[in-house]
Amino acid sequence: MGSLSIWHWILVIAVVLLLFGRGKISDLMGDVAQGIKAFKKGMQDDDKPADKPEPAKSIEHNAAPTAARSDVGSKAV
């Protein structure tokens, strides 16, 4: 009583075909296949090594000499 016989499965498949139709099921399976292909392609893209970044360019900075401040440590009254 707890197991489904072959007749139960045939009835379930017949109801599914009547509800969805043959065209909708094949379209659905095609969409699933495209999704799997896109997923596999995305996983393969992750395996490729990343492009090596160019080394950073150095910036030459000529700082002008500044005058020393004498009031650095004093408090204003």
Curated annotation (Swiss-Prot):
Record key words, sorted: Cell inner membrane, Cell membrane, Membrane, Protein transport, Translocation, Transmembrane, Transmembrane helix, Transport
Phylogenetic lineage: Bacteria, Pseudomonadati, Pseudomonadota, Alphaproteobacteria, Hyphomicrobiales
Known function: Part of the twin-arginine translocation (Tat) system that transports large folded proteins containing a characteristic twin-arginine motif in their signal peptide across membranes. TatA could form the protein-conducting channel of the Tat system.
Region (Disordered), start-end ranges: 42-77
Keyword Cell membrane attributed: yes
Subunit structure: The Tat system comprises two distinct complexes: a TatABC complex, containing multiple copies of TatA, TatB and TatC subunits, and a separate TatA complex, containing only TatA subunits. Substrates initially bind to the TatABC complex, which probably triggers association of the separate TatA complex to form the active translocon.
InterPro entries the record matches: TatA/B/E, TatA/E
Entry protein name: Sec-independent protein translocase protein TatA
Bilayer-spanning residue ranges: 1-21
Protein family according to the UniProt entry: Belongs to the TatA/E family.
Record bears the keyword Transmembrane helix: yes
Source species of the chain: Bradyrhizobium diazoefficiens (strain JCM 10833 / BCRC 13528 / IAM 13628 / NBRC 14792 / USDA 110)
Compositionally biased tracts (Basic and acidic residues): 42-60
Record GO biological process: protein transport by the Tat complex
NCBIfam families per the UniProt record, alphabetical: PRK00720.1, tatAE
GO cellular component terms given for this protein: TAT protein transport complex
Chain coiled-coil ranges: none
Predominant subcellular localization, coarse grouping: membrane
Lipid bilayer topology: Single-pass membrane protein
Gene, per the UniProt record: tatA
